[in-house]
């Protein structure tokens, strides 16, 4: 499901008890969102006749069931990849000449 259509449905439900697909489409077009008719039809089929508060509660329950952090194995892989890249970055940094300090470039803002 696309969250932009769900947000438009929630907004439309503030003015109507049961917003139509045309109502949601009008809100999307008002904020210059390109509307994919197939996706919008699927979203409307899934949420029509349901209370927005219930949809939010169901979504919150599903989100709380998802893991919040990545696994330790994936973190180890990224740490080793970052460790390999560090010496290469240090070597590249040594090749660059140091730039001289610009000082205040003659502006004297706080004199």
From Swiss-Prot:
Processing and modification events after translation: Phosphorylated.
Keyword Ribosomal protein: yes
GO MF term (any one): structural constituent of ribosome
A UniProt-annotated Pfam family: Ribosomal_60s
GO annotation, biological process: cytoplasmic translational elongation
Taxonomic superkingdom: Eukaryota
Statement: the UniProt record of this protein carries the keyword RNA-binding: no
GO cellular component terms attached to this protein's record: cytosolic large ribosomal subunit
InterPro entries: P1/P2_N_sf, Ribosomal_P1/P2, Ribosomal_P1/P2_euk, Ribosomal_P2
Keywords of this entry: Phosphoprotein, Ribonucleoprotein, Ribosomal protein
Family in the record: Belongs to the eukaryotic ribosomal protein P1/P2 family.
Function field: Plays an important role in the elongation step of protein synthesis.
Subunit structure: P1 and P2 exist as dimers at the large ribosomal subunit.
Protein name per Swiss-Prot or TrEMBL: Large ribosomal subunit protein P2-2
Gene: LIP'
């Amino acid at each position: 499901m696309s969250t932009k259509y769900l947000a438009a449905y929630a907004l439309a439900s503030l003015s109507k008890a049961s917003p139509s697909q045309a109502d949601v489409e009008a809100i999307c077009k008002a904020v210059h969102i390109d509307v994919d008719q197939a996706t919008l039809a699927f979203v409307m089929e899934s949420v029509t006749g349901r209370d927005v508060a219930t949809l939010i509660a169901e979504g919150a329950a599903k989100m709380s069931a998802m893991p919040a952090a990545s696994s330790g194995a994936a973190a180890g892989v990224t740490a080793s990849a970052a460790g390999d890249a560090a010496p290469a970055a240090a070597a590249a940094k040594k090749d660059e000449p140091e730039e001289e300090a610009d000082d205040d470039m003659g502006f004297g803002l706080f004199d």
